[in-house]
Amino acid sequence: MNEMSSVRLPFRDGYYDVRPTKIVALAKNYAEHAREMGSEPPEEPIIFLKPPSALIGPGSSIILPRRSKRVDHEVELAVIMGKRAKNVPASKAFDYILGYTIILDITARDLQAEARKKGYPWTISKGFDTFAPIGPRVVDSRELDPSDLEIGLKVNGKIRQLGRTSQMIFKIPELIEYISHIMTLEPGDIIATGTPPGVGPLRHGDRIEAWIEGIGKMEFDVLAEDSILC
């Protein structure tokens, strides 16, 4: 893996190297977010994949690609798998979780809209390098109940997103059951569990602060691709 595919985060008394084989993300898993996107809440989980190459950790910057004119933030609770999971029932799902952290599902919204209009997958809008910031630490699954945590995001000090994980349509055990009946989840794989309402555009020079109760907060600068190219 290249260096952007591996992020080292504090975990227990040491560190954990985040090296997923895949990032499985949820679309429209908060009802109000589904509505702000012009949809009704789904009847079953809507999943898509983000590439591990999109991962960055604290201290890195989110890069706005020249190809997109509208890049949005989405703050999400990330579940990191601790054991190989295949056909796991919801009743046993928590036994397979290593821990929790925060992930941003950065999205090129204009490219997503174009892809939807053509009936194409969303990968082009979700897969750019730096489009999966993660941090600030991994919290042991035994030390945190993820069922009702405040989750939020500020841009330049102003609150954009604020919700609670209890507002998820499909809860973590349901997600693990659903996903593991489709694909095997390997140790280290990440499930990004969806975002509360309030998603919005990012611009060059913005400063993002994202937080989840019990995990902490992380901050990232936003830079236009043109500003870092020679």
Swiss-Prot record:
Signal peptide: none annotated. InterPro entries: Fumarylacetoacetase-like_C, Fumarylacetoacetase_C_sf. The keyword Metal-binding applies. SUPFAM superfamilies: FAH (SSF56529). A divalent metal cation binds at E74, E76, D105. One of its GO terms (molecular function) is metal ion binding. Keywords: Metal-binding. Belongs to the FAH family. This is Uncharacterized protein PH0643. It comes from Pyrococcus horikoshii (strain ATCC 700860 / DSM 12428 / JCM 9974 / NBRC 100139 / OT-3).
